[in-house]
Amino acid sequence: MKQDATRNAAYTVDCEDYVHVVEFNPFESGDSGNLIAYGGSNYVVVGMCTFQEEETDIEGIQYKTLRTFHHGVRVDGIAWSPETKLDSLPPVIKFCTSAADLKIRLFTSDLQDKNEYKVLEGHSDFINDLVFHPKEGQELASVSDDHTCRIWNLEGKQTAHFLLHSPGMSVCWHPEETFKLMVAEKNGTIRFYDLMAQQAILSLQSEQTPLMSAHWCLKNTFKVGAVAGNDWIIWDITRSSYPQETRPVHMDRAHLFRWSAISENLFATTGYPGKMASQFQIHHLGHSQPVLIGSVAVGSGLSWHRTLPLCAVGGDHKLLFWVTEI
């Protein structure tokens, strides 16, 4: 008998607003807890959470808000900087946001008196994704509906600018070879750029469109995953520029794709909030069906924990967390 994969969230945290985006800090911050940031209609909250899976004396989840940052406009995207450190004196919290007013804001805080932000302007349409340089964090990349990928330094100056053939949906930096950048376009093309030569070196093609989200697998950078139309799609760049595996998953169109940080076979997808609730699914490449299905009334955002097989999704006045096995 087939086991039902539908699960309620293992843990929830109440929030003061509808959560548009949520991001675990993917970098080591020097503290045993996990930094998490989420964005609402006009603010960003940075908090710390610890789960019973990592600390036996905790029951469920322990969550504490560290700081709320006024944002003044809806938060659409959040990216953590590797410069964030909780074990330094004073601590450093550094992240950037993309917003509905087409601006990027770079926030820096010591969680006490120093709270600064800088505005980066240049995109002429909606910003779909942004990411920091994963080593030094001295640059960030963004992609937009304005058919560009832009690289910025922390002063707000553009250091590179790539013209795309369609809206840029996702951007990822290679974790080790930091001169390589992946950009996914809505027309189904994923290109890899050499930032030293400032040119494309490789491209992948999806047969489905619109491509809404793509992600580079950090555990195995030969693997790229995406969602387009109703399907999830996996490429192995050593084999072909065409997909290795494709599977339909979300009836109301797929929305987001994220690889787990700890396994090259584990990934999560979300659907658009459609006629039913928005569906959240965890998939394992060894299984033909999703290994976990969750339902969120109005879900948005998707992020994996840095060291656990645990996913966060934003909801209506709450954060929801699902746990699976590897």
Curated annotation (Swiss-Prot):
One of its GO terms (biological process) is protein transport. Keywords: Cell cycle, Cell division, Centromere, Chromosome, Chromosome partition, Kinetochore, Mitosis, mRNA transport, Nuclear pore complex, Nucleus, Protein transport, Repeat, Translocation, Transport, WD repeat. The keyword Nucleus applies. One of its GO terms (cellular component) is nuclear envelope. SMART domains: WD40. InterPro entries: NUP37, WD40/YVTN_repeat-like_dom_sf, WD40_repeat_CS, WD40_repeat_dom_sf, WD40_rpt. It comes from the Eukaryota. Coiled coil: none annotated. The keyword Nucleus applies. It is found in: Chromosome, Centromere, Kinetochore; Nucleus, Nuclear pore complex. WD repeats lie at residues 70-117, 122-162, 164-203, 294-325. Pfam families: WD40. SUPFAM superfamilies: WD40 repeat-like. Component of the Nup107-160 subcomplex of the nuclear pore complex (NPC). The Nup107-160 subcomplex is required for the assembly of a functional NPC. The Nup107-160 subcomplex is also required for normal kinetochore microtubule attachment, mitotic progression and chromosome segregation. Component of the Nup107-160 subcomplex of the nuclear pore complex (NPC). The Nup107-160 subcomplex includes NUP160, NUP133, NUP107, NUP98, NUP85, NUP43, NUP37, SEH1 and SEC13. This is Nucleoporin Nup37. It comes from Mus musculus (Mouse).
